[in-house]
Amino acid sequence: MLKILNTVLLFFDCFSTGTFFVLLIYLFTRLRTHLLHFSSSNCHLDVIIYQSRAVIIFLVVFVYFIGVLTCKINDKILVHTMLRNKRQLNTLFYTLILFTFALCSLSSVLFVPYTSFAIFLLSTSVFLLFSDLSVFFIVLEYYLLEIELVNYEHAKRHCLLSHLFSNQLFVDHMLGMFLKTSLFSISTTSKYAYLESIFKCTLMEQIIYIMIVFVFLPSFMRIFASYAKRMYGEQKKCLVSNKGVSSSTRKRRHSYSSGHSYVEYRRMSVHNLIGYVVNPNCHYKCWSTTFVIFVSLIILHLNNRYSERISSFKHNSSENEVFPVLYHITAYEVTSIFHFIYNIFHVINANLVVYLFLGLFLFKRIRLNKPINSQLRNLNIPKIKETLISDQVKQSPVLPKFSKKLNDIPLQSRKRIYCLHKDDDYIDRNDSSSVSTFSNTCKNSNERPSNVLDLDMLTEKIKQGLGHELSDTEILQLLSHGRLKTRELESVVRNPFRAVELRRLDLSTFLNNPHIIERIPYKDYDYRLVYGQCCEEVIGYMPIPVGKIGPLLLDGRSHYIPLATTEGCLVASTNRGCRAIFLAGGIKSVVYRDQMTRAPVVWFPSIIDSVKCIAWIDSEEGFQTLKSAFDKTSAHVNLLSVFACPAGRYIHIRFAARTGDAMGMNMVSKATDSALHCLKKYFSNMQVISLSGNMCTDKKPATINTILGRGKSVIAEAHLSADVLAQVLHTNAQRLARLTHSKNWIGSAMAGCPGMMGCNAHAANIIAGMFAATGQDLAQVVDSSSCLTQLEVDLSDDSLVASVTMPCLEVGTVGGGTRLSGQRACLDLLDLSVDRPTEHLSRIIAGTVLAAELSLMAALDTDDLVKAHMHFNRAKQSTNSHSCSHSTTTDNNDNISNIYDNHNVALSSKIPVTDNSDIRESVHSLHVKPFPVKSDLSVNPEISHYTM
């Protein structure tokens, strides 16, 4: 039956394609006749000039149309397709475009008689300007995918019904096309003969365009798919073999699966055509609104036509013949019915009947296909009823003998059966009828229950690279049965978003409450940037609030810093530190070392051999040899030093290299592997134990990193006057210096913090927030937060010299998470230097850490830390979810200074701003007033200082 259906469909496709080609040839013949008639006639000069204007307008519109068309073909189709003959494919597309728009334009010559050449050109220009190219390319993409699958059976659905039943996306385009048709129809009733002539031709071109897009184009593409299938059959052996993989596909180098490695295709942007996820309620409202406009235009068209008809009767008939339609109804002749129908068609305009019928059919289809929300993330996937046969038989008291026989069967031979039922209840495990059905089925191995899918057939489809054709239910069954792994979903379905949805569905079956997964967001995210780069087994993403810090005045430039955090008061406190630094003249920063390290561990049979290896590495010849092998792996890597540290017969070799704008871990690892292969040529008895021997040291606190440095080593310094300290931070330099000594030095030493890890207040807060916002490796927070905070008193004017030293800040501006759109936007927000963006980023991070350290130390000194947290973190939330009663950041710097201030200070006098010769930006002088500062000896306030 299926073969007969395919034959009939193929016959229809050939017939429709041939009909359109014959029609095109006939129209070209008619056009040639018109052109010859035009050239043979005696044309006056004004007529030729009039025709020339139309020709110029048409040429301008045509050139614009060709430009848009070329961009769309290159961007929408040729970039995403996996077919190899792209030049021939490009020629085919342009041929189809020429055929389509030539047939649409020339149709006005046949269906609209007595059309002048100028009106023909102008109507064609209007049609080209208003033509919907999107639906044309969507149909091409839809059937191009079928061609890539080289399977004609999957393209057997017919034209208009195919698009309506397969995807709701086409409904939008069809409604838009019918709306344009109705607008052209209204223009034919404008009572201006010239405009009516133009839009009559345009209306006919639009109707022919609809017929081509939804009848001819699918038929032609299905014939093309059939041809591709035959070509595929001839080359099938070449494509199936492991050596015959085309350039557009690639094999996995190492597959985690126990089966053979399947072909992994490049990503295609076909998610808009297959598995299109929309908001049903929103689209239904848009469709309803569009259809109301469409019907209104039809009614307006009928009214205009009827009014024109009535006015003509008034001029040509007597008063008794004003309504000839009613006269024909009252007549007793049989022919009066035909006159009545003729008059109605004359009033309606027969061209309108075609798209009126299609519009009513489309509206009926929309009403019948109104989307219904499912219970789990708007996915209309039937529930899978799963029963394990062994458990079912063991619980059944009816078949004890069969249960005993089943226990003798090896576990590898037992299969799980998945049944699809119309109801929503799971199968009762104690139902003896289902067990009896299974036992009867097992007696005849050739018979298979109708409700059990052939898992072997589905697995074979995946091996052939046709996994994206499977339904969601079939893929979920393969996952549950162990035939498919969730990590392979992106390669199988070739749609990252659909893979995430399927993985969430599979995970929900293992949860006690499957609706928990609904609270993890996953929509509105480009997973193409994640797959194969940032994360595996993706089930969604985790949104984190991002706060704005700034302006931070760093080396004469102001920066606004994005900070991703869930800790209250952190952004507000850092803003206060930024304000103090801004008023003090800014921060000076410098990068004094830049190197990424990797330290493999090797083994030698004797300590003599290990010492010889160390001597060779320390020699100039050895270093240059290793450097040559190291640097050739990448154009951005540059080996700086090699440090060999022995431990008995083991040697830890620490390679240090510059890596450009990347953080460089993968780059250095690859280069180190190449250097080890080179080293083994000189020491054949060397054995590589591990590419990383923990002397790097990566993602662990280590003193070697603070001494020798890893990543970017940065120092940032600011000089704050006593007035700025008193006004903004409400303290003085002596108190901050004493607090730093007792907290950061003595307290960290008593706690046993290694190296610089404890010599700061909360540097990790800023490091973690900025790493999350800018797409850095979050695990690098461990060693990147090594920070030495120094607050010293300048005895000359009681000012404060604040500095932070960060020897191992491991950051990058390319690769990894910096590819993600949100993280890339945060990097762009920082306005990094074009020449050395990564060094600039490290200096900004160090400056932000300094601002945060100053504010927290001042808050601890003035005992405002708890008050601020109670004020902001324990604030009562407003009942309105769209409003917030408290804000952690403000745009006004004057409000930032009041975060820890419970006093209303009036600004009256001025203070000087600390002079900084390296800072070019000028800071306006501010008014100050005395402010009480807490005394060291008592709780009473000291004598008032002049503060800002």
Swiss-Prot record:
Q: Which SUPFAM superfamilies match?
A: NAD-binding domain of HMG-CoA reductase (SSF55035), Substrate-binding domain of HMG-CoA reductase (SSF56542)
The cross-references to InterPro entries, in alphabetical order and at most eight, read: HMG_CoA_Rdtase (IPR002202), HMG_CoA_Rdtase_cat_sf (IPR023074), HMG_CoA_Rdtase_CS (IPR023076), HMG_CoA_Rdtase_eu_arc (IPR004554), HMG_CoA_Rdtase_N (IPR023282), HMG_CoA_Rdtase_NAD(P)-bd_sf (IPR009023), HMG_CoA_Rdtase_sub-bd_dom_sf (IPR009029)
Give the annotated active site.
Answer: 567 (charge relay system), 699 (charge relay system), 777 (charge relay system), 869 (proton donor)
What membrane topology does this protein have? Multi-pass membrane protein
Q: Where in the cell is it found?
A: Endoplasmic reticulum membrane; Peroxisome membrane
Tell me the pathway: Metabolic intermediate biosynthesis; (R)-mevalonate biosynthesis; (R)-mevalonate from acetyl-CoA: step 3/3
Report the transmembrane regions from the record: 9-25, 55-71, 96-112, 124-140, 207-223, 286-302, 347-363
- Region (Linker), start-end ranges: 364-466
* GO terms, biological process: cholesterol biosynthetic process; coenzyme A metabolic process; isoprenoid biosynthetic process
UniProt-recorded Gene Ontology molecular function terms: hydroxymethylglutaryl-CoA reductase (NADPH) activity
User: One Pfam family this chain carries?
Assistant: HMG-CoA_red
**Gene Ontology CC terms:** endoplasmic reticulum membrane; peroxisomal membrane
- Which sites carry carbohydrate? 316, 430, 895
Name the coiled-coil region(s): none
| Region feature (Catalytic) | 467-948
Keyword field: Cholesterol biosynthesis, Cholesterol metabolism, Endoplasmic reticulum, Glycoprotein, Lipid biosynthesis, Lipid metabolism, Membrane, NADP, Oxidoreductase, Peroxisome, Steroid biosynthesis, Steroid metabolism, Sterol biosynthesis, Sterol metabolism, Transmembrane, Transmembrane helix
According to its UniProt record, the EC number is 1.1.1.34
UniProt keyword Membrane, yes or no: yes
Query: What catalytic activity is recorded?
Result: (R)-mevalonate + 2 NADP(+) + CoA = (3S)-3-hydroxy-3-methylglutaryl-CoA + 2 NADPH + 2 H(+)
PANTHER family assigned:
3-HYDROXY-3-METHYLGLUTARYL-COENZYME A REDUCTASE
Q: What does this protein do?
A: This transmembrane glycoprotein is involved in the control of cholesterol and nonsterol isoprenoid compounds biosynthesis. It is the rate-limiting enzyme of sterol biosynthesis.
Q: Family, per the entry?
A: Belongs to the HMG-CoA reductase family.
Write the protein's name: 3-hydroxy-3-methylglutaryl-coenzyme A reductase
UniProt lineage: Eukaryota, Metazoa, Spiralia, Lophotrochozoa, Platyhelminthes
